Amino acid sequence: MPKIIEAVYENGVFKPLQKVDLREGEKVKIIAGNLVERLRKYRVKVDSDIVAEFISERR
């Protein structure tokens, strides 16, 4: 299952910003970029009354 690990790139090395659950030597793929920008294409505009109705049905 994919994991999102925030990291900083310094001196040619990606440094995770939190503890990671990986084995020593495990290979990973890094996708650089802003997650918000990538997810924006999946966003759908919905009227506030539809959102309110949805929320009330879930309660």
Swiss-Prot record:
Alphabetical UniProt keywords: Toxin-antitoxin system
Presence of keyword Transport: no
**Xref: InterPro entries:** AF2212-like, AF2212-like_dom_sf
UniProt keyword annotation of Endoplasmic reticulum present: no
Family from the record: Belongs to the UPF0165 family.
Q: What does this protein do?
A: Possibly the antitoxin component of a type II toxin-antitoxin (TA) system.
Q: What is this protein called?
A: Putative antitoxin AF_1090
Q: What is the lineage of its organism?
A: Archaea, Methanobacteriati, Methanobacteriota, Archaeoglobi, Archaeoglobales
